[in-house]
């Protein structure tokens, strides 16, 4: 078996790896500082489409974590780039927040509820029956169904929240149409992120806390994968999957010396 190349570029998930319930995970600051000091290409990825990179930069800064705006890659950005490639200057009906609508505006998309090319479902905390009904009718009328990410639940201080995947399932039940999910574990999001920083999969690593999104996305993109145990996955969970990460570590602190 060919020896793996040293890791030259890093992609890391945010929730469960760098932060947990709004608090930095020990080692996150040291890891990010070493990345910045080394000059190695890196991205912080998130399937959450609510916030813009500028919003996330500000939130992380308030926690004491310095991540430049250009080093943040969201499922909203990946979705906008995908749609700009698929249908430049197209139109969309959007259920989502500023992170998604801003990304679509930035690639020249028209947001409308009149005969759109696409219905795009993203993360929001204010899903309305009216908006979901409109989405169902537009999809039944021929609009193509896109969703930013397949996560069924998202974290909060009070416990799990229903997320994009759960709401997409509702729309699928009403229309018979399944969405195309752009975010992790779709390797499309990973490859677009790698391209954005000029990195190559064979010399890059993905760090995550979820087997079903982070590790799977890294594997399918041909990257080395590190599973941390500071998020949703526990050691006993790993054997439930037919694939394994390259390494399992306790936390991001264990990876500082690899940068």
Question: What does each model-identified segment do?
Answer:
Residues 2-40, 49-73, 77-259:
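Asp-based, Mg2+/Mn2+-dependent phosphohydrolase catalytic module
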């Amino acid at each position: 078996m060919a020896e793996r190349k040293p890791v030259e570029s890093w992609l890391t998930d945010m929730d469960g790896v760098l932060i947990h319930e709004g608090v930095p995970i020990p080692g996150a600051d040291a890891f990010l500082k070493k990345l910045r000091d080394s000059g190695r290409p890196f991205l912080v990825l998130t399937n959450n489409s609510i916030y813009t990179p500028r919003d996330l930069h500000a939130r992380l800064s308030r926690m004491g974590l310095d991540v430049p705006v250009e080093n943040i890659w969201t499922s909203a950005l990946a979705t906008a780039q995908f749609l700009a490639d698929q249908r430049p200057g197209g139109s969309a009906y959007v259920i989502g927040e500023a992170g998604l609508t801003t990304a679509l505006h930035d690639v020249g998309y028209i947001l409308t509820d009149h005969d759109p090319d696409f219905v795009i479902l993203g993360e929001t905390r204010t899903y309305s029956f009216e908006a979901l009904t409109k989405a169902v009718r537009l999809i039944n009328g021929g609009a193509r169904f896109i969703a930013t990410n397949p996560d069924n639940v998202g974290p909060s201080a009070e416990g799990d929240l229903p997320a994009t995947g759960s709401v997409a399932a509702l729309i699928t039940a009403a229309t018979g149409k399944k969405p195309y999910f752009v975010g992790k574990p779709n390797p499309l999001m990973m490859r677009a992120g790698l391209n954005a920083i000029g990195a190559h999969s064979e010399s890059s690593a993905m760090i995550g806390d979820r087997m079903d999104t982070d590790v799977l996305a890294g594997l399918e993109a041909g990257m080395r994968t590190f599973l941390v145990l500071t998020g949703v996955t526990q050691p006993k969970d790993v054997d439930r999957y037919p694939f394994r990460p390259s390494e399992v570590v306790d936390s991001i602190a264990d990876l500082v010396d690899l940068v």
